[in-house]
Amino acid sequence: MKASMFLALAGLVLLFVVGYASESEEKEFPRELLSKIFAVDDFKGEERGCKGFGDSCTPGKNECCPNYACSSKHKWCKVYLGK
């Protein structure tokens, strides 16, 4: 009887500790998420010298990034397949 009470109490303590730890991690999650969003936002502020997929371009000017080509039909950069 004493052993089962001890195990039940130990289980409750373990459950409390795990719940507290996961709750404290959840409180830190929004801060980490916001810091990552702002870090990505800072990266987007830098301008590239070339145009990426779906950006408008002028055929024949070679404005698209490597592995992309300006489509003469649609006038936007798309993946260059080598044809």
UniProtKB/Swiss-Prot annotation:
Signal sequence residues: 1-21
Record-level GO cellular component terms: extracellular region; host cell presynaptic membrane
Main location: secreted
Intracellular or extracellular location(s): Secreted
InterPro entries assigned: Huwentoxin-1 (IPR011696), Huwentoxin_CS1 (IPR013140)
Tissue: Expressed by the venom gland.
Function, in words: Selective antagonist of neuronal tetrodotoxin (TTX)-sensitive voltage-gated sodium channels (IC(50)=1270 nM on Nav1.1/SCN1A, 270 nM on Nav1.2/SCN2A, 491 nM on Nav1.3/SCN3A and 232 nM on Nav1.7/SCN9A). This toxin suppress Nav1.7 current amplitude without significantly altering the activation, inactivation, and repriming kinetics. Short extreme depolarizations partially activate the toxin-bound channel, indicating voltage-dependent inhibition of this toxin. This toxin increases the deactivation of the Nav1.7 current after extreme depolarizations.
Full protein name: Hainantoxin-III 1
Species, as recorded: Cyriopagopus hainanus (Chinese bird spider)
